[in-house]
Amino acid sequence: MTYDEYKEKVKTLKKWAYAYYVEDNPVATDEEYDRLYHEVLDYEMKHPDKALEDSPTKRVGGIVRDEFTKAKHIKRMWSMEDVFSKEEVQDWLDRVEKNVGECDYFCEPKFDGASMNLLYDDGKLLRAITRGDGVVGEEVTDNVRTIRSVPLVIDYKGLIEIRGEVVIRKDDFEQINEERLKAGEAPFANPRNAAAGSLRQLDSSVTAKRRLVFYPWGIGENTLDQKKLSEKMEFIYGQGFLRPPYHEACHTIDNIEKFYQFLISKRDEIPMMMDGMVIKVDEIEKQEELGYTVKFPRWMCAYKFPAVEKVTQIRAITLQVGRTGVITPVAEIEPVNIEGAMVSRATLHNFDEIERKDIRIGDHVIIIRSGDVIPKITKVLIDRRTGDEIPVERPTHCPTCGSELLDEGALIKCQNLECPDRVINTIIHFAKKGCMDIDGLGSKIVEQLVKEGKIHDILDLYSLTYEDLADLEGFKEKKISNLLDAIAASKGAPLHRLITAMGIEHIGEVASRALALEFGLGIVDAKYEDIVAIDGIGEEMANSLLEFMRVNREKVLKLFNTIKPTVEKKVEAKENPFKGKIVVLTGTMSESRGKIKEMLEELGAKVSGSVSKKTDFVIYGEDAGSKLTKAESLGVPTLTEDEMRAML
């Protein structure tokens, strides 16, 4: 076989593979495909230096890993703001157009799958990373290479991040679950879980069998010069990526609503699960001008589809004990399929709601589920009662530890601080991101450690040894050392994160920061009048903090002594031209904008990402763009970086 013949056969094999795996429309028999596949493989084994990067043989799974490594996105992968009605869409449009004027909008289906970031370097697929926390995800490149709708090579120089959704078709999802049931394995709850679970297989040959599909929806790092997102996406589609079955350019709320209703009408026909429609400002310059909140881009939102209702029957009511001791009733229901998700539980919130709705065991009820929202019961079908239904009694003793419960009406609490369920949930909260961020200490491991008697409270984490973990099922040398290293690394964390991690009722991240700055380690002895004097801290929060410290003072002091948290210093900015001012930065400065932002915040300024009439100063560097133009049109004072420094 000559090299030209080899290239032609690779081209044919790619066409056949795409038709079979992506379009679900085979154009060759299995025998023909296998024969051609092995001809190509034989040539590549004899001439490995001539093997093409995008040959279908490169996709076959078989690589087995011990674990996944963490990898950082070049540009952050953001979440999206959700809207649920035409009125909420109009509010969102009003906010957008108030800042940047009339816009073109790019609308497309929102597929329900696992978000993925593909990094290409000079056209070759270099890395595939899960969304993770938006900054860091898990590298799953070997698994993603098995997805036929992911090109291994594209026509692009330099680095480009192509973001999209990995999904499973509805028919394939049902087939996978049938196979899992036959093998004695638990079925996946929904296609999203199936896609995510398939991507996290340590053996890539398992992923290869799952027939995953990748739909691109956005771009991170890139040097494309198109002025609109839709134009950039046309370039991406032209590289061999799948185009969504429908997408639309819209200009008004009526255009948007019409396309939204059209997608709803196609919901059952489209082979992938959709849970809404994504609306994006199309013009790149306006996207940059709108910027981002802490969580979302201001230039895009997800218009979620209506909740789906189903009728089912309550089999039993079980009780869950949270970290604060609150007892939450959960309805165990006859399993029902809602939009591809098998639902077997629904939240009941509290016992007052059970009494208000007169919910009984054996009742037929209507439940709804919308997106990621936990299914809930909306109505009891009283006309279907037979008389055999059993009223639900308010519990008097904890289902886990048996201690007497405190009934406060809507809330019923277990007051035993050593209740195993309270301990487990307290430690899970303590270890999660935004708190102590102990990597690898997930819910299953916490449950195992508590049930095996290795830990009884948070403090016990910091005295765990290799020997404590060596005899536990599933704990190998590397896993043990990684966990112990992660626990040790959490020492010295900022005090506000430790306060958040303690799980004090009503005290969230923002309040924890304010308390840490005001009191430092003296928070254990803080007085009521000093607490409520802090901006944003009310009576309920103050009382909650005081009660927590009264009960747990000695434990908190031991935590401080063990963890030695970093105490942030409260520095009152001296009088300066920027104290209390709203400032916007734009253009290239002599040092990173992050450092200049930090400097201005230390001076008491609030640094915003967008220009408005409320902006006091726009400070600009080289290649300043639309923010500077908008400031000038609004009459907002503008300063060069040198002028800003001169004012100081």
From Swiss-Prot:
Q: Which GO terms describe its cellular component?
A: cytosol
Query: Which annotated residues bind NAD(+)?
Result: D30, E31, E32, Y33, D34, S79, M80, E108, R131, E165, K280, K304
Task: List ligand-binding residues for Zn(2+).
Answer: C398, C401, C414, C419
Q: State the reactions this protein catalyses.
A: NAD(+) + (deoxyribonucleotide)n-3'-hydroxyl + 5'-phospho-(deoxyribonucleotide)m = (deoxyribonucleotide)n+m + AMP + beta-nicotinamide D-nucleotide
The reply on keyword DNA repair is yes
Q: What is its EC number?
A: 6.5.1.2
**Database matches in PROSITE patterns:** BRCT, DNA_LIGASE_N1
Active site annotation, chain numbering: K110 (n6-amp-lysine intermediate)
Pfam families per the UniProt record, alphabetical: BRCT (PF00533), DNA_ligase_aden (PF01653), DNA_ligase_OB (PF03120), HHH_2 (PF12826), HHH_5 (PF14520)
Q: Where in the numbering of this chain does the BRCT domain appear? A: 573-648
Kindly list the cofactors needed: Mg(2+); Mn(2+)
- Alphabetical list of Gene3D superfamilies matching this protein: 5' to 3' exonuclease, C-terminal subdomain (1.10.150.20), 6.20.10.30, BRCT domain (3.40.50.10190), DNA ligase/mRNA capping enzyme (3.30.470.30), Helix hairpin bin (1.10.287.610), Nucleic acid-binding proteins (2.40.50.140)
Keyword vocabulary terms for this entry: DNA damage, DNA repair, DNA replication, Ligase, Magnesium, Manganese, Metal-binding, NAD, Zinc
Gene Ontology MF annotations: DNA binding; DNA ligase (NAD+) activity; metal ion binding
Q: Does the keyword Protein biosynthesis apply?
A: no
Q: Which Gene Ontology BP terms does the record give?
A: DNA repair; DNA replication
Q: Which family does it belong to?
A: Belongs to the NAD-dependent DNA ligase family. LigA subfamily.
Protein function:
DNA ligase that catalyzes the formation of phosphodiester linkages between 5'-phosphoryl and 3'-hydroxyl groups in double-stranded DNA using NAD as a coenzyme and as the energy source for the reaction. It is essential for DNA replication and repair of damaged DNA.
Question: Per its UniProt record, what HAMAP family does this chain match?
Answer: DNA_ligase_A
Q: Under which name does UniProt file this protein?
A: DNA ligase
Organism whose genome encodes this protein = Sulfurovum sp. (strain NBC37-1)
What gene is it encoded by? ligA
